[in-house]
């Protein structure tokens, strides 16, 4: 049974109903419809914390989806799952892949910055300030890109950039 039929969440049900209506009225190929169905089911599984199921759906959606913009969001969501699982190298890979297809994803830049900042903090705990600074510099670059795309957002990152004198 498709995940959209078994989900009990009101918002997810509403999204599924609207998505199903749009799939019927918007002229799309059967492959595009199938890709969206996998994407929708992946989002539903992800929202419930069923990451393995979400990944299966997202991988299938990436196999079918041909539009780069739509693929960027699928890849971004895969990155989110890897981030949640502590698989930061994989997460960074998927955020990069998402940005290759859609360079206007400030949330991907932000998440990459958060991972780099976290790695900088880890390096400090291990006593390696040189490596930490390198990670912090990389985090700053990603945060600058996120802020440039959405001025007024990422206030904490903006403050960190000012405090650490990394904001130009």
UniProtKB/Swiss-Prot annotation:
It is found in: Plastid, Chloroplast thylakoid membrane. Keywords: Chloroplast, Membrane, Photosynthesis, Plastid, Repeat, Thylakoid, TPR repeat. The keyword Heme does not apply. One of its GO terms (biological process) is photosynthesis. It holds the Pfam family TPR_1. PROSITE patterns: TPR (PS50005), TPR_REGION (PS50293). It comes from the Eukaryota. InterPro entries: PSI_Ycf3_assembly, TPR-like_helical_dom_sf, TPR_rpt, Ycf3/AcsC/BcsC/TPR_MFPF. It is a peripheral membrane protein. The keyword Chloroplast applies. TPR repeats lie at residues 35-68, 72-105, 120-153. Its main location: plastid. One of its GO terms (cellular component) is chloroplast thylakoid membrane. Essential for the assembly of the photosystem I (PSI) complex. May act as a chaperone-like factor to guide the assembly of the PSI subunits. Belongs to the Ycf3 family. This is Photosystem I assembly protein Ycf3. It comes from Nandina domestica. The lineage of its organism: Eukaryota, Viridiplantae, Streptophyta, Embryophyta, Tracheophyta. The gene is ycf3.
């Amino acid at each position: 049974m498709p995940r959209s039929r078994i989900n009990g969440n009101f918002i997810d049900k509403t999204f599924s109903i609207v998505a199903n209506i749009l799939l019927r009225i918007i002229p799309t190929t059967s492959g595009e419809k199938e890709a969206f169905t996998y994407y929708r089911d992946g989002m539903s599984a992800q929202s419930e914390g069923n990451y393995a199921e979400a990944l299966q759906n997202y991988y299938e959606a990436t196999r079918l989806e041909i539009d780069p913009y739509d693929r960027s969001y699928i890849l971004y969501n895969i990155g989110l799952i890897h981030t949640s699982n502590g698989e930061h190298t994989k997460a960074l890979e998927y955020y990069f892949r998402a940005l290759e297809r859609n360079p206007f994803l400030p949330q991907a830049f932000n998440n990459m910055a958060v991972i780099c900042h976290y790695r900088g903090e880890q390096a400090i705990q291990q006593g390696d300030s040189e490596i930490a600074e390198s990670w912090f510099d990389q985090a700053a670059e990603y945060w600058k890109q996120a802020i440039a795309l959405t001025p007024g957002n990422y206030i904490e990152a903006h403050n960190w950039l000012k405090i650490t004198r990394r904001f130009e």
